Amino acid sequence: MKRGIDIVQALKNSKRSKSSDDSVESKLSKASPDLSQYAAVQISKEDVTVNPEVKSTIDNHKKEPPSIASSIKKSPKTVIGKHANSTKKPKKRTPLDQQFIDLKNEYPDCVLAIQVGYKYKFFGVDAVPVSRILNIMFIPGNLTERDATHDKFAYCSVPDNRLHIHLQRLLTNGLKVAVVSQTESAVLREAESSKGLFLREVTAIYTKATYIEEGSGDFISCITWNGTSAGAVTVQPCTGEIIVEDFSEKEPEALSELQTYLHHLRPSEIIVTDNEATKENDKLSRLLKSFGGARISYKPFDEVSPIEELLPASIANYYVTNHSTTTTQCISQLITYLKDFSLDQIFTVPSNVSKFSTKMYMNLPGNTLKALEIFQNSSGTEKGTLFWHLDHTHTKMGRRMLQKWVSKPLIDNASIQERLDAIESLMNYNYAVEVFEGIIKKIGRDESDWEKSMIKIHYTANGSQNRVTRKEVVQLLLQFRSVIDTVYKFKSSFKDSSISKLLQSMFSELAELASTPIVNDLLSRVKIEAVYREEVEDQKKEFFDLDSHPHEGIKSELNAISELEQALQDELVEIKKIIKKPVDYMTVSREPYLIALRGDSGPQDWLKISATKTVTRYRPPKVSKLYKELLYHQEKLIQQCDEAFATFLKDIDSHYTYFSRLIKIVAEIDCLLSLKATSSSNSGYSKPILSDKQMIKAKRSRNPVIENLTSTSQYVANDIEISYDENRVLIITGPNMGGKSSYVKQVALIALMTQIGCYLPCESAIVGIFDTILVRMGAEDNILKGESTFMVEMSECSTIIKSLTNKSLVILDEIGRGTGTEDGIAIAYSIISYLIEEPRLPLTLFITHYPSLKVLEDTHPKNVANYHMGFMEVAKADQEWPDVTFLYTLKRGVVSNSYGLNVARLAGIPSEIITKAFKVAEALKQDIEDSELSSMGQILKSEQSSASKLVEIDRIVSYI
C-alpha cells in the first residue's frame, strides 16, 4: 500500500489547485466547526479555558488552516494521501462510515474511539489530534462527511487491549472521548441469524476528571451565581465525595470565599451556570480564569430539569430540605452533566455529602494556603510543603483523609487533645495495635483504594457500565475481612488502659462492625481462587460457588455446554469409524475440535480449516454444527455470569453505608499513624500543651519543613513568645535573606500542626487555639485581574482587616513596599497601628524594612515588641562594604540596614557596581532616616485621640 506523500508536499500541491475549496487547507478549515469538540466544552465563549495543547490544535484549524501542517508534521508517522486535491464526487458510503457519521452527529463534542474487531479506530477529523498526541500512523482519507478526496474516512487505530493506556494520554491532553463498543459478538449474530452491520453503542464517555478507572482523584465543581446569592457543589467521582458550600450575599466576600473554596479543592473542571448575573460579573470571570489549569464551561440552567425529576423522591427531598436553592441548582446541573459519563448516581448516596466550611474547623483562606505552602510549593509540586512533611500514610484513603485534616485543622480543644493523646498512645508499644498497623501497611503495598472500589461498585450496581473487576471485588472483601478478623481477635486488647480514648472508640466501632456477618456471607458466595485464573472468561465462569449459592441461568448453560462437549466426544468415536484411524481432536491457533490427516485425504464434505505441506486439518460437518452450538452457549454462559455478577454487586452496594463506616475508621487510624511517624521519627518533637488563651510559647522551635529538607544539625532553633497578654504584636526587621519569612512561617506552622493534632518541632510548647490564620506575603501582580503588585497587596490587606477575629493569627510581610517610600511608610504604620488598637486584638507578626516603625514599641510597650534576625558584619580590606554572616537567631531590637548589597554580591553582581551602590546608599541613608523620623513624629503628634486615629485608619482602609 502506498503511504501517500508528506503533508507539506500535500499543502504545496493544494496551492496549485484551481479551486481553493478543494485544498487541504480548505478541508481543514471547513472542519473547524467540528474541532471545538476536542475540549469537553464548546469554544464559542471567549471565557472558556481549555488545555493549551488542544487549544493550539483547534485554533490552528480554525484560524490559520495551513499551520495545521506543522502541527501534524511533528509526528513522523503522520501522512496524507497524494490525491488531496481530488475533486471527484463522493462514492457511496460504507455502512461503517455511515455509522461513524451518525454517532458523530449524536456526540459532536467527543472524539469517538470506535471498536472494529480487535482495534479501536478514530475516524475523520478525530484522527488528526489523536494521531499527533499518541504519535501513531495517520491513514489518509476524508476528514469530514463533506469531503470527496478519498473513498473512506481518514483514521488511526490502537489495539483494543491497550485502549485505556492511550485514553489516559488523550484525556490528559484535554480531549473528551466517547468509547463506542461492539455490543454483539460474531457468534451470537450467526446463531441468531443477524445480518447487516455490527451493533455499536457509546458505552462510556470520559474527561480527565471523570476517568475513574485510573484517575488521579480530580474534582469537578459547579458554581451558581444569581446576583444575590452564590453557591457551589464539588464532586470527586473516583471516591463519591460531595462538598457543598453557600457564599456570602455581598459580592466581595463571596468572591473571596469562592477563591478559598477553589484553592482548597483545586478542581480540574469548573461548570458555571450561564445566566445574566454570571455574564455581567467580570470579577467572577477573572477569578475563574486565574485557575488556569481548570477547564471552565458555561451551561445554561434553563435546560436542566428540577432536582425532583432527576433523583428518587426521598433523596431529592433530602437535598431540597437540607440545602439552599443555589446548592440544589448546582446539584441538578452536575447530575445532568455527569449523566453522559454514567456517574450521576454519585448523588444517590447523601451520606457522602459534607459542608466545606463549618465552625468545627480553622479557616484557612486561599492566600494562606499559598503563602505557607501547605499543599503546593512555589514550583507547583508537593515536596517541601507541610502536607509533604506530615504525610506518612500507607493507604490512598488515608492520604485523602490526611489532606482533609491538614486543610481543616480542629478548633475544639477536646478534639485536638484526643488526637494528641492518640499519637502518644501509638508511640507506646502495643502488640494488637502493631498487628493492625501491619494490616494497614499491607493494604498500602497492595495499592488498594477502598473508597474508589466502593464507588465503582455503586456506579455499576446502579446502571453504569461495568467499572470493577471480579478480582478487585474479591480483594476488597478479603481486605475487609482481614481488618474485621484482627479486630475481633484482639477486641479485648484494644480496651487496654494504655490505649487512648479516641483509639478505643475507633476500635470499639470496628468491633461492632465485625460482629455482623456481611463480609463473610458475601465471600461465601464466590470461589476466591477463580479470580487468579489467567483467562478472564475462566474467572467469569468459575467465580460463583454454585453448590452453596446456585444460579439457575448459569447452571442451565453449563449443562448445555456439558451435553455438547459429550456430543462432540461421541462424534469423535464415529469419526474414528469412518476414517478407520486412531485420531483425536486437536487445537491449533485457538481453533479447537480439528482432525488432522496427512496430505489431503479427508472426505470432501469435511471443512478444511488449515494445512501445512504434510498435514491438513479438518472439521467434519456435524462437528462444525456442534461447535457452533457450543460457542453460542459459551457466549450465553458469559452473559449469565455477567448478570449474576451485576446482582452480586447490587448486594454489596446495599451495604454501602456499612462499608463506608469501616473505610472511614481505617483511614483515620492511618492518619493517626502518619502523625505518629512525624512525631516520633524526628528528634526533638514534643507534645504541645493546649491553652485557653491566645498565645504561642515554644522553646527552641524549628521550621518543620525546612528542617526536613536540610540536616537537623544545621538548623538554628528559635524561641517563640507571642501572647494576648504581652508581645501581642511582633515587629521584625533584619537583613535580606536573614530568615524573617522562614521564622514567621514557622510560627504559623506551629499553630497549624498543633490544631491538626501533631507533635511539634521544639523542646516544649504552650499553644492557644486559633480560628483563622491570615497571611499577606510575597510580591506579585495579577495580570489576569488587571491588578498591580501594590493593588494585590492592598486588596489582601483589606480582606484580612475585614476577616479579623479575636482568635486570629495575622502575618504581614513588608506592607507598603509596592509603592513609594513615603506612602509605604505611612500605610505600613497605619495598618500596624490599626492591628495594635483593634478591639478584636489579633496576634500579629509584622515583617518590615522600615526601621522607623520601631517607635510603636515606645507608644505601646505592653503590646508591641521589636525583634530582628541576628547577623554579623565582617569587614574586608579589599572592599568598602562589609560582608554579612547570617545567624538566623531571633533577637530583641531593630536593624536599620537591610544589607541588600550583600544579597547583590551573593547573586553575582559585579563588585564595581556594588561599590558604587554602597557609596550612594551611605549618602542617602541619613537623609531617609531623618525624613522618616520627622514624618513619624508628625503622625504621632497629630494623633491626639483615638477618634483621630480611627479617621486615619478609615482613610487607609478606604484607599485599600
From Swiss-Prot:
Task: Show the SUPFAM superfamilies listed in the entry.
Answer: DNA repair protein MutS, domain I (SSF55271), DNA repair protein MutS, domain II (SSF53150), DNA repair protein MutS, domain III (SSF48334), P-loop containing nucleoside triphosphate hydrolases (SSF52540)
Q: Which GO terms describe its cellular component?
A: MutSbeta complex; site of double-strand break
* Pfam family for this entry, one: MutS_I
Q: Which portions of this protein are annotated as coiled-coil regions?
A: none
What the entry lists under InterPro entries is as follows:
DNA_mismatch_repair_MutS-lik_N, DNA_mismatch_repair_MutS/MSH, DNA_mismatch_repair_MutS_C, DNA_mismatch_repair_MutS_core, DNA_mismatch_repair_MutS_N, DNA_mismatch_repair_MutS_sf, DNA_mmatch_repair_MutS_con_dom, MutS
The record's annotation in SMART domains points to: MUTSac, MUTSd
Residues holding ATP: 734-741
Task: State the Gene Ontology BP annotations.
Answer: gene conversion at mating-type locus; maintenance of DNA repeat elements; meiotic mismatch repair; reciprocal meiotic recombination; removal of nonhomologous ends; replication fork arrest
Family classification: Belongs to the DNA mismatch repair MutS family. MSH3 subfamily.
Assembly and interactions?
Heterodimer consisting of MSH2-MSH3 (MutS beta). Forms a ternary complex with MutL alpha (MLH1-PMS1).
Q: What does this protein do?
A: Component of the post-replicative DNA mismatch repair system (MMR). Heterodimerizes with MSH2 to form MutS beta, which binds to DNA mismatches thereby initiating DNA repair. MSH3 provides substrate-binding and substrate specificity to the complex. When bound, the MutS beta heterodimer bends the DNA helix and shields approximately 20 base pairs. Acts mainly to repair insertion-deletion loops (IDLs) from 2 to 13 nucleotides in size, but can also repair base-base and single insertion-deletion mismatches that occur during replication.
Q: What is this protein called?
A: DNA mismatch repair protein MSH3
Q: Which gene encodes it?
A: MSH3
